[in-house]
């Protein structure tokens, strides 16, 4: 929830120091480091020291978690595309992309949006999306996974009933 043990600068320096000291370093990152992560910042910093980098990609939670629940991000006759957006910007404000997404016919995956849920729901309602099926999945694909299913109209109540959080 935005609480980090190390600053990004400390992580960058740790990677470089270990690469020089041990001949290599591995940065194992939870989530996709190139979707609202700092993967490119780390690579740029490390390569500025002449250190070769390699990325071993995984599958983004924005696709894997819905799939694990049988939720299709695109479906013939329903949704031709999907958007992955942040709910909360680095300045802790609601992303303006939420307004655009609410007007789209695309499936919308909102990461880091729980603290802005009330605002997000209001925006989708404003664009007549009250009955859109909605899922909130906390700690997806882990043993502590919690799932709340509803519509834009009901999802805030579902969050309270299921005690979902970010």
Question: Language-model segments: which ranges?
Answer:
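Class I SAM-dependent methyltransferase SAM-binding "motif I" and its flanking Rossmann-like core
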Residues: 30, 34-104, 146-150
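A contiguous loop/helix-start segment that scaffolds small-molecule binding in enzyme catalytic cores
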Residues: 9-10, 20-26, 38, 81, ...
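Active-site donor-binding loop signature of nucleotide-sugar glycosyltransferases
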Residues: 2, 86-87, 139
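Class I S-adenosyl-L-methionine
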Residues: 1-56, 144, 156
